[in-house]
């Protein structure tokens, strides 16, 4: 097999580059791959632009090496290329929600065995305005932590960097809800909210059951809205999130849709996150699912 590695060298801890060398060496030595081309990113959008150049049949698969942001760029590039190139994932980021949801192996032996077996899973892709995503679009409380935490903090502290940044912002954001309107094919929801997530998988922000009914192959999004609440309601909500039963909380709205139009009815600016990246054009949002939009290499 012939493959292309698209690597974000700034992702992961200090020993991560040695891990990549081990994986590449094993793929060649065990004759799983007979050609491996390497592309290293230097700046934002490099991964997307390289993946966008792919042509059908040029490679048997492309490997996204980095965090959720790198994976997002590769997904955008592959979709835009229309090459239908399968994507394998080596996670080096801080949270790695999509890889967690699919239980993708991260050790050298497990990854190489997965490539050798080469089982493909066709999954849905999301589109928000003119960008594609694989896991989540979110806005509100804690949702912008991913792109505010510096690379140095993530490299040193790992997931703790997110928790510290989020804890500092939580009191301020809790008392500043914003009004949003959500319009789907069948319903309209308008309310004062703290956070919303349009999800493709169950795992968001390191929490494995944020959207307990979500599936990457059902052709719909799961939409989670956390409404304005009082202080007495927050502890039961947090406990519910940890147990995956928060959708029964009175301040939570949970529904599924193929498309959703989202309007910010507040005066203030609300940042939008898609797969850990900042969505520059912001509101209003038109989010739609692209059923069976991409192929992912998964373990048996």
Name each model-derived stretch.
Residues 69-82:
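Short Gly/Thr/Asp-enriched flexible loops that form oxyanion-binding sites at enzyme active sites
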Residues 1-62:
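ATP/NTP phosphate-donor binding region
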Residues 151-161, 212-233:
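Gly/Ser/Thr-rich active-site loops/lids in small-molecule metabolic enzymes
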Residues 9, 65-67, 90-92:
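Glycine-rich beta-strand-to-loop/alpha-helix junction loops that act as flexible
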Residues 17, 184, 190, 215, ...:
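ATP/nucleoside-binding phosphotransfer catalytic cores, i.e., glycine-rich phosphate-binding loops
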Residues 138, 142, 197-210, 278:
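Glycine-rich phosphate/pyrophosphate-binding beta-alpha loops
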Residues 30, 41, 80-194:
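Catalytic core of DAGKc-family lipid kinases
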């Amino acid at each position: 097999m012939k493959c292309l590695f698209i690597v974000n060298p700034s992702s992961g801890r200090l020993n991560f580059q040695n891990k990549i060398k081990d994986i590449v060496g094993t793929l060649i030595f065990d004759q799983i791959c007979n050609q491996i081309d390497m592309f290293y990113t230097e700046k934002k959008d490099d991964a997307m632009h390289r993946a966008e150049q792919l042509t059908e049949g040029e490679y048997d698969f492309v490997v996204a090496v980095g965090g959720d942001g790198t994976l997002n760029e590769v997904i955008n590039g592959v979709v835009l290329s229309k090459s239908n190139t399968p994507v394998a994932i080596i996670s080096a980021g801080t949270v790695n929600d999509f890889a967690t949801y699919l239980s993708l192996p991260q050790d050298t032996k497990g990854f190489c065995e997965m490539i050798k077996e080469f089982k493909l899973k066709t999954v849905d892709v999301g589109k928000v305005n003119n960008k594609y995503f694989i896991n989540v679009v979110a806005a509100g409380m804690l949702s912008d932590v991913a792109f505010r935490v510096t690379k140095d903090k993530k490299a040193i502290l790992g997931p703790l960097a997110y928790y510290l940044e989020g804890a500092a912002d939580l009191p301020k954001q809790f008392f500043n809800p914003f009004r949003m309107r959500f319009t789907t094919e069948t319903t309209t929801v308008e309310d004062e909210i703290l956070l919303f997530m349009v999800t493709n998988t169950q795992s968001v922000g390191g929490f494995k059951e944020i959207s307990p009914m979500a599936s990457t192959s059902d052709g719909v999004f799961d939409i989670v809205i956390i409404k304005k609440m009082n202080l007495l309601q927050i502890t039961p909500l947090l406990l519910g999130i940890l147990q995956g039963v928060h959708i029964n909380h009175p301040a939570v709205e949970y529904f599924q849709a193929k498309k959703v139009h989202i309007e910010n009815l507040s005066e203030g600016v609300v940042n939008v996150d898609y797969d850990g990246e900042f969505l520059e054009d912001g509101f209003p949002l038109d989010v739609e699912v692209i059923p069976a939009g991409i192929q992912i290499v998964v373990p048996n």
